[in-house]
Protein backbone atom coordinates (compact mmCIF):
# COMPACT_ATOMS: atom_id res chain seq x y z
CA UNK A 1 0.00 0.00 0.00
CA UNK A 2 1.08 3.57 -0.71
CA UNK A 3 1.06 6.40 1.81
CA UNK A 4 0.88 10.06 0.83
CA UNK A 5 2.39 12.62 3.21
CA UNK A 6 1.51 16.24 2.33
CA UNK A 7 4.61 18.24 3.26
CA UNK A 8 4.34 21.50 1.32
CA UNK A 9 3.19 23.78 4.15
CA UNK A 10 5.27 26.83 5.00
CA UNK A 11 5.18 26.28 8.75
CA UNK A 12 4.37 29.92 9.52
CA UNK A 13 3.42 29.08 13.10
CA UNK A 14 7.03 28.04 13.70
CA UNK A 15 8.71 31.12 12.23
CA UNK A 16 11.46 32.22 12.17
CA UNK A 17 13.13 28.78 12.17
CA UNK A 18 11.00 27.54 9.26
CA UNK A 19 12.51 30.21 7.01
CA UNK A 20 15.37 27.76 6.52
CA UNK A 21 14.30 24.46 8.14
CA UNK A 22 11.18 22.59 6.93
CA UNK A 23 8.72 22.22 9.80
CA UNK A 24 8.68 18.47 9.15
CA UNK A 25 12.39 18.42 10.04
CA UNK A 26 11.98 20.11 13.41
CA UNK A 27 13.18 17.76 16.18
CA UNK A 28 10.90 15.79 18.45
CA UNK A 29 13.24 14.46 21.14
CA UNK A 30 16.19 13.10 19.10
CA UNK A 31 14.88 12.89 15.53
CA UNK A 32 12.83 14.97 13.08
CA UNK A 33 9.05 14.82 13.24
CA UNK A 34 8.80 13.37 9.74
CA UNK A 35 10.68 10.23 10.80
CA UNK A 36 7.88 9.34 13.21
CA UNK A 37 5.43 9.56 10.31
CA UNK A 38 7.46 7.26 8.06
CA UNK A 39 8.03 4.85 10.92
CA UNK A 40 4.29 4.77 11.66
CA UNK A 41 3.53 3.97 8.03
CA UNK A 42 6.19 1.26 7.92
CA UNK A 43 4.95 -0.33 11.15
CA UNK A 44 1.45 -0.54 9.62
CA UNK A 45 2.79 -2.53 6.67
CA UNK A 46 3.03 0.30 4.15
CA UNK A 47 5.93 -0.13 1.74
CA UNK A 48 5.89 3.10 -0.27
CA UNK A 49 5.71 6.71 1.01
CA UNK A 50 5.24 9.74 -1.24
CA UNK A 51 6.03 13.21 0.10
CA UNK A 52 4.15 16.06 -1.58
CA UNK A 53 6.58 18.95 -1.17
CA UNK A 54 7.52 22.37 -2.51
CA UNK A 55 10.73 24.32 -3.09
CA UNK A 56 12.92 24.43 0.00
CA UNK A 57 11.97 20.98 1.28
CA UNK A 58 14.92 19.01 -0.10
CA UNK A 59 16.09 18.22 3.43
CA UNK A 60 13.17 15.80 3.86
CA UNK A 61 14.30 13.63 0.95
CA UNK A 62 17.95 13.92 1.94
CA UNK A 63 17.21 12.62 5.43
CA UNK A 64 15.94 9.30 4.06
CA UNK A 65 18.71 8.95 1.47
CA UNK A 66 21.98 7.07 1.71
CA UNK A 67 25.16 8.97 2.58
CA UNK A 68 27.93 6.46 1.87
CA UNK A 69 30.76 8.80 2.90
CA UNK A 70 29.30 9.41 6.36
CA UNK A 71 28.52 5.73 6.83
CA UNK A 72 32.08 4.76 5.86
CA UNK A 73 33.60 7.35 8.19
CA UNK A 74 31.49 6.19 11.14
CA UNK A 75 32.37 2.56 10.48
CA UNK A 76 36.07 3.39 10.21
CA UNK A 77 35.95 5.34 13.47
CA UNK A 78 34.20 2.49 15.25
CA UNK A 79 31.17 4.64 16.05
CA UNK A 80 28.78 1.72 15.84
CA UNK A 81 25.90 3.32 17.72
CA UNK A 82 25.95 6.42 15.53
CA UNK A 83 26.18 4.23 12.42
CA UNK A 84 23.13 2.29 13.57
CA UNK A 85 21.15 5.52 13.92
CA UNK A 86 22.25 6.73 10.49
CA UNK A 87 21.24 3.43 8.90
CA UNK A 88 17.75 3.32 10.41
CA UNK A 89 16.30 4.70 7.17
CA UNK A 90 17.02 1.32 5.55
CA UNK A 91 14.32 -0.27 7.73
CA UNK A 92 11.62 2.08 6.51
CA UNK A 93 9.32 2.10 3.51
CA UNK A 94 10.70 3.42 0.23
CA UNK A 95 10.32 7.18 -0.06
CA UNK A 96 9.61 9.36 -3.09
CA UNK A 97 8.56 12.95 -3.62
CA UNK A 98 6.53 15.12 -5.96
CA UNK A 99 6.20 18.90 -6.02
CA UNK A 100 2.99 20.84 -5.36
CA UNK A 101 3.64 23.90 -7.50
CA UNK A 102 0.97 26.10 -5.94
CA UNK A 103 -0.37 26.04 -2.34
CA UNK A 104 -4.01 25.38 -3.21
CA UNK A 105 -5.01 23.26 -0.24
CA UNK A 106 -4.84 19.71 1.05
CA UNK A 107 -7.14 18.34 -1.64
CA UNK A 108 -4.90 19.81 -4.33
CA UNK A 109 -1.84 18.31 -2.61
CA UNK A 110 -3.42 14.85 -2.66
CA UNK A 111 -4.19 15.23 -6.38
CA UNK A 112 -0.46 15.51 -7.05
CA UNK A 113 -0.15 11.87 -5.96
CA UNK A 114 -2.58 10.51 -8.56
CA UNK A 115 -0.05 9.23 -11.09
CA UNK A 116 2.11 7.67 -8.36
CA UNK A 117 -0.71 5.93 -6.49
CA UNK A 118 -2.60 4.69 -9.53
CA UNK A 119 -5.79 2.68 -8.99
CA UNK A 120 -5.01 1.31 -5.53
CA UNK A 121 -6.34 2.43 -2.14
CA UNK A 122 -3.85 4.55 -0.25
CA UNK A 123 -3.20 6.13 3.13
CA UNK A 124 -2.79 9.83 3.88
CA UNK A 125 -0.76 10.85 6.94
CA UNK A 126 -0.66 14.52 7.88
CA UNK A 127 2.74 15.21 9.44
CA UNK A 128 1.37 17.87 11.79
CA UNK A 129 -0.44 15.09 13.68
CA UNK A 130 1.92 12.75 15.51
CA UNK A 131 0.33 9.63 17.00
CA UNK A 132 1.35 7.69 20.08
CA UNK A 133 3.50 4.83 18.73
CA UNK A 134 1.62 2.29 20.82
CA UNK A 135 -1.79 3.30 19.50
CA UNK A 136 -1.38 1.32 16.25
CA UNK A 137 -4.05 3.62 14.80
CA UNK A 138 -3.15 3.14 11.15
CA UNK A 139 -2.99 -0.64 11.51
CA UNK A 140 -6.48 -0.62 13.07
CA UNK A 141 -7.79 1.55 10.23
CA UNK A 142 -6.45 -0.99 7.75
CA UNK A 143 -8.28 -3.72 9.68
CA UNK A 144 -11.53 -1.75 9.37
CA UNK A 145 -11.06 -1.36 5.63
CA UNK A 146 -10.32 -5.06 5.22
CA UNK A 147 -13.47 -5.94 7.18
CA UNK A 148 -15.89 -3.40 5.73
CA UNK A 149 -14.32 -1.91 2.61
CA UNK A 150 -14.66 1.73 1.69
CA UNK A 151 -12.68 4.68 2.96
CA UNK A 152 -11.69 5.10 6.60
CA UNK A 153 -10.77 8.29 8.47
CA UNK A 154 -9.59 8.79 12.03
CA UNK A 155 -11.70 10.84 14.43
CA UNK A 156 -10.74 12.80 17.51
CA UNK A 157 -13.04 13.83 20.35
CA UNK A 158 -12.95 17.63 20.66
CA UNK A 159 -14.79 20.48 22.34
CA UNK A 160 -17.21 22.57 20.24
CA UNK A 161 -14.67 25.40 20.22
CA UNK A 162 -11.90 23.10 19.02
CA UNK A 163 -14.16 21.63 16.34
CA UNK A 164 -14.18 24.96 14.48
CA UNK A 165 -10.54 24.31 13.52
CA UNK A 166 -11.21 20.79 12.18
CA UNK A 167 -13.56 18.95 9.86
CA UNK A 168 -16.59 18.42 12.11
CA UNK A 169 -18.53 15.19 11.59
CA UNK A 170 -21.99 13.81 12.19
CA UNK A 171 -21.67 10.13 13.08
CA UNK A 172 -23.57 6.98 13.95
CA UNK A 173 -22.00 4.15 15.93
CA UNK A 174 -21.44 0.81 14.19
CA UNK A 175 -20.80 -2.65 15.65
CA UNK A 176 -17.13 -3.64 15.59
CA UNK A 177 -16.48 -6.57 13.21
CA UNK A 178 -14.55 -9.61 14.33
CA UNK A 179 -10.82 -9.19 13.82
CA UNK A 180 -10.83 -5.41 14.31
CA UNK A 181 -8.94 -4.24 17.40
CA UNK A 182 -11.42 -1.57 18.49
CA UNK A 183 -13.70 -1.35 21.49
CA UNK A 184 -17.44 -1.03 21.06
CA UNK A 185 -18.34 2.59 20.44
CA UNK A 186 -15.07 3.33 18.63
CA UNK A 187 -16.28 2.53 15.11
CA UNK A 188 -18.63 5.01 13.45
CA UNK A 189 -20.11 5.84 10.09
CA UNK A 190 -19.74 9.48 9.02
CA UNK A 191 -23.12 10.81 7.88
CA UNK A 192 -22.11 14.46 7.46
CA UNK A 193 -18.98 16.59 7.48
CA UNK A 194 -18.19 20.31 7.41
CA UNK A 195 -14.70 21.78 7.15
CA UNK A 196 -13.92 24.34 9.90
CA UNK A 197 -17.55 25.20 10.68
CA UNK A 198 -18.71 28.18 12.72
CA UNK A 199 -19.51 27.27 16.31
CA UNK A 200 -23.25 27.04 15.71
CA UNK A 201 -22.74 24.51 12.88
CA UNK A 202 -20.51 22.03 14.73
CA UNK A 203 -21.99 18.59 14.06
CA UNK A 204 -20.76 16.55 17.03
CA UNK A 205 -17.90 16.08 19.45
CA UNK A 206 -15.97 14.16 16.79
CA UNK A 207 -13.66 15.76 14.24
CA UNK A 208 -11.36 14.36 11.57
CA UNK A 209 -7.70 14.05 12.57
CA UNK A 210 -4.86 13.52 10.11
CA UNK A 211 -5.09 9.85 9.13
CA UNK A 212 -7.06 8.59 6.13
CA UNK A 213 -7.43 5.43 4.05
CA UNK A 214 -8.94 6.45 0.74
CA UNK A 215 -10.23 4.79 -2.40
CA UNK A 216 -8.62 6.05 -5.63
CA UNK A 217 -12.07 7.35 -6.62
CA UNK A 218 -11.24 10.33 -4.43
CA UNK A 219 -9.03 11.67 -7.22
CA UNK A 220 -12.00 12.02 -9.57
CA UNK A 221 -13.99 13.65 -6.79
CA UNK A 222 -11.18 16.13 -6.09
CA UNK A 223 -10.99 17.04 -9.76
CA UNK A 224 -14.65 18.05 -9.67
CA UNK A 225 -14.95 20.16 -6.51
CA UNK A 226 -14.97 23.91 -6.14
CA UNK A 227 -12.65 25.78 -3.77
CA UNK A 228 -13.98 25.55 -0.22
CA UNK A 229 -12.94 26.96 3.14
CA UNK A 230 -10.15 29.50 2.78
CA UNK A 231 -10.42 29.45 -1.02
CA UNK A 232 -8.57 26.12 -1.08
CA UNK A 233 -9.43 22.70 -2.48
CA UNK A 234 -10.29 20.71 0.63
CA UNK A 235 -9.75 16.97 1.00
CA UNK A 236 -12.87 16.98 3.17
CA UNK A 237 -14.98 18.12 0.22
CA UNK A 238 -13.39 15.48 -2.00
CA UNK A 239 -14.13 12.46 0.16
CA UNK A 240 -17.57 13.82 1.07
CA UNK A 241 -18.38 13.98 -2.64
CA UNK A 242 -16.91 10.52 -3.20
CA UNK A 243 -19.19 8.88 -0.62
CA UNK A 244 -22.25 10.93 -1.51
CA UNK A 245 -22.48 13.26 1.48
CA UNK A 246 -24.11 16.67 1.00
Q: Where do the protein language model's features map onto the residues?
A:
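Conserved beta-strand segments of alpha/beta enzyme cores
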Residues: 24, 94-96, 189
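Conserved beta-loop-beta/alpha segment of the NTase-like Rossmann-fold superfamily
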Residues: 70-73, 80-177, 214, 223-225
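N-terminal glycine-rich phosphate-binding loop and ensuing alpha1 helix
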Residues: 1-76, 100, 136-140
Amino acid sequence: MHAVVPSAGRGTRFLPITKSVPKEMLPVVDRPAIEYIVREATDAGITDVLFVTRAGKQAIEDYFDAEPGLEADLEKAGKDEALEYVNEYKKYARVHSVRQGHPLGLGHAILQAKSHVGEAPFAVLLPDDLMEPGSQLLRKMIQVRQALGGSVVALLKVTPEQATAYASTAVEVLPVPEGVDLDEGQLMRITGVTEKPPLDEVKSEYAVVGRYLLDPAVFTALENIEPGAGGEYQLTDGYARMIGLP
